[in-house]
């Protein structure tokens, strides 16, 4: 996925059974992304299911519609369903792990109801995985597996929000790879072009200023098996951790620096 493919285009028209993970540190980015995903779905007449924390729902709702009564009407007609993520998660857990039968009843039943309402395709956004990963990665991956199982019998697209910093070296030591493998697509940052510039500069910092960094990056990308669809720049970061692990943290530190000091980047709306 090149820098010319934006997260906006990924979220505007997801295919059935597309399973997307979004990383974010700023709630505003989450609201923009979910607003895009949900808003486009509603405009196309699709049903939308949100399993969301109340504060995030309030922020997302403000981006969707200034007139709250319009959202209330969508909920009455069954085109929009909003569930509390913490309450939903509490209903699913048995001995600390998500239970398949309970998941099928709660989430499968909600997807069934959205489909039966006659609004065409279904889009779902969920935050239960992010709440769960703060205490148990194994339980988080199990919940992702249950979502994936449900997608084999139900036709819907899914966006999962993860409050993770893509430039934190700790998550690059296994967590990000596990999360990526559980999804079809990963949205690592707000600005793909900015990330591409940051990675290009970081490669030059680490591997030398001549033409070798670009050649090395191309070689890494040619041989790196991406766990999910992601921007080339993100794959170039992960590839270094696989092929030259001793330099991975230093590269990520330089990417972080260049991304956050890139004065060519436009301000987010």
Located regions from the model:
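Non-catalytic regulatory/interaction regions at protein termini and inter-domain linkers
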Residues: 1-269
């Amino acid at each position: 996925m090149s820098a010319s493919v934006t997260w906006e285009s990924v979220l505007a028209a997801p295919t059935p059974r597309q399973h997307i993970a979004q990383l974010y540190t700023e709630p505003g980015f989450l609201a923009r992304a979910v607003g895009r995903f949900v808003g486009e779905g509603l405009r196309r007449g699709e049903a939308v299911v949100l399993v969301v924390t109340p504060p995030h729902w309030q922020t997302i709702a403000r981006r969707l519609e200034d007139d709250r009564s319009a959202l209330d009407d969508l909920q009455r007609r069954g085109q929009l369903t909003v569930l509390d993520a913490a309450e939903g998660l509490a209903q699913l857990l048995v001995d600390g792990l998500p239970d398949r039968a309970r998941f099928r009843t709660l989430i499968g039943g909600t997807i069934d109801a959205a489909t039966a309402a006659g609004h065409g395709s279904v889009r779902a956004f969920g935050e239960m995985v992010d709440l769960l990963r703060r205490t148990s990665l194994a339980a988080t991956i199990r919940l992702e597996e249950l979502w994936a199982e449900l997608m084999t019998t139900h036709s819907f697209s899914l966006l999962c929000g993860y409050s993770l910093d893509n430039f934190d070296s700790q998550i690059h030591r296994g967590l990000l790879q596990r999360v990526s493998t559980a999804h079809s697509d990963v949205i690592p940052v707000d600005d793909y072009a900015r990330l591409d510039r940051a990675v290009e500069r970081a490669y030059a910092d680490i591997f030398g200023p001549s033409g070798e960094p670009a050649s090395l990056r191309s070689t890494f990308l040619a041989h790196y098996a991406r766990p999910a669809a992601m921007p080339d720049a993100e794959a170039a970061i992960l590839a270094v951790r696989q092929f030259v692990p001793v330099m991975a943290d230093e590269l990520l530190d330089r990417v972080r620096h260049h991304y956050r000091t890139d004065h060519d980047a436009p301000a987010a709306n």
